[in-house]
A protein has these predicted regions:
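Mature catalytic core of soluble alpha/beta enzymes
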Residues: 2-249
Length: 249
């Protein structure tokens, strides 16, 4: 019988001695349409092997804990699966750098800092994410909007100070938003309004989890379960089981 995946475990977990720190601090390359990119190191928290062959690896990414549970693919042993899970965590850390608005060196931060009306070069990876974000905005008629950075900053400030923003402040923030006012094409992005700031937090973890799943499958690990604490994705079920068993507390 496959083990239960406990969805609330991340609230109580502690940092265990990492038996595979060197594996989680993996440096490799992401290969695909974007070309090659160095993978950043990942803060290791724990890795464990179960009697049924399952490998569980946890790492600190995107300000939270990502957990990858996986079974070795054909011709692999547990060590191979452990290494590949570490690569998947490093993949998430790589995309965090692509999508981060807090990292002053990121392409998104440079786009946020640029004046409106100016064409700003963006990397193929950032362009991919921005185009997907705009697709989501169109599909939801703006319910999802990657340009809401000014509103997010305003309400974070309001919460910190314990004072509601004034109507004028809200109107000012809203005028700087609007996904229709962002143009992305041919490696360039243009903001059509002053003060616009992009925030991809509404899709970042889910996007990273999708890329992790792609990497695991490419490396030959098809039976896996990824948990980013807010987004989960299951691959093929554990060997001999109809699916992954979840327990929600």
């Amino acid at each position: 019988m496959s083990p239960w995946v406990r969805m609330s475990s991340f609230f109580r977990q502690a940092a265990f001695p990492a038996c595979c720190a060197c594996l989680l601090s993996v440096a490799g390359a992401i290969r695909g349409q974007e070309g090659e990119a160095e993978l950043p190191s990942v803060e290791p928290l724990s890795c464990a092997h179960s009697p049924d062959g399952r490998v569980t690896v946890r790492g600190a990414v995107m300000g939270t804990v990502f957990t990858v549970r996986a079974y070795p693919g054909s011709g692999m042993d547990a060590g191979d699966a452990e290494r590949i899970c570490g690569e998947a965590l490093a993949c998430a850390a790589h995309w965090e750098k692509v999508m981060s608005a807090m990292d002053a060196e990121s392409g998104l931060a440079r786009l946020n800092a640029a004046e409106y009306g100016i064409s700003v070069p963006v990397s193929p990876e950032l362009e991919r994410v921005l185009l997907l974000a705009l697709d989501y905005a169109r599909l939801t008629n703006g319910a999802f909007d990657p340009t809401l950075g000014p509103c997010i900053r305003l309400w974070k400030k309001s919460r910190r100070l314990g004072i509601l923003p004034s109507g004028e402040e809200r109107e000012c923030a809203l005028r700087a938003c609007g996904w229709e006012k962002l143009s992305v094409r041919k490696g360039m992005a243009v903001k059509a309004v002053s003060g616009m700031r992009l925030d991809l937090g509404g899709m970042g973890k889910g996007f990273a989890v999708d890329r992790m799943a792609e990497m695991l499958k490419t490396r030959g690990v098809c039976s896996f379960f990824i948990d980013s604490t807010s987004d989960v994705l299951a691959g093929a079920p554990p060997p001999g089981e109809p699916g992954w068993r979840l327990r929600v507390d």
